[in-house]
Amino acid sequence: MIDTILPIPDLFAATRVLCIQPHYDDNDIAAAGTIARLTAQGCEVIYVTVTNDLMGVVDGFATDDEARIALKRDQFAAASHIGITQQHWLDYPDAGAYDYFAVRRDILMHIRRIKPDFVMTCDPWLTYEGHRDHIQTGLAVSEAVMFAGLTRIASSDPTVDAAYQSHHIAGIAFYFTREPNVIVDITSTWPQKVAALRSYHAQFDDAGLDELVTAFDHKSRQVAQGQAFARGEPLKVLHTSALHCGI
């Protein structure tokens, strides 16, 4: 593999990070430890959730409205443990049919409106990723990051486009990746991550939450092997110019 010639941007130099996830728990499952560190140092971290996440709700008797309430309840509970105070939802159908370019337009709108200096999402190029929501979200975010300054490419809100003045996005961080170039030390924020994960009751029963925490207990230790800390989260962090033509 030929590495990019561009430097790896410093995620922890960011002051505003936009984390865009396919489902309501992906940011926290993958990167709650990292995010808790960011918010602890004063970084503003904002969440956007692409799908309505209704397909994974474990209560088979819940109506869609009841499921939506439960999902939001979980998200706000998890957010309280890691310092998230602002969330937005795009409400595309979970594991369903929706237009990729509509998603990209919505994400582009939020990038232009919020003006983050760093963006985080799932790696759409993860080997063997079988969930299209993850692939489409990661790719749409990558394109939106590249196209944010090209105002001839419309977002979903013309008023946002008209008011937008180009800003600098220092980098993009991909989680759920098998090609990390940064391992973040989450030893100090591991308890916050566990508390966030244990907030997700709508899609996990108690046994499922135990399995989830156990899996990421092992994973956090595995990725920290050879590092000077006990627990880590793997990220692929790229300069935005590395997203096109293999620079």
Q: What kind of region is each of these model predictions?
A:
Residues 1-114:
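Active-site rim/loop-helix segments in enzyme catalytic domains that contact anionic ligands
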Residues 1-20, 97-247:
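Metal-dependent de-N-acetylase/amidase catalytic core
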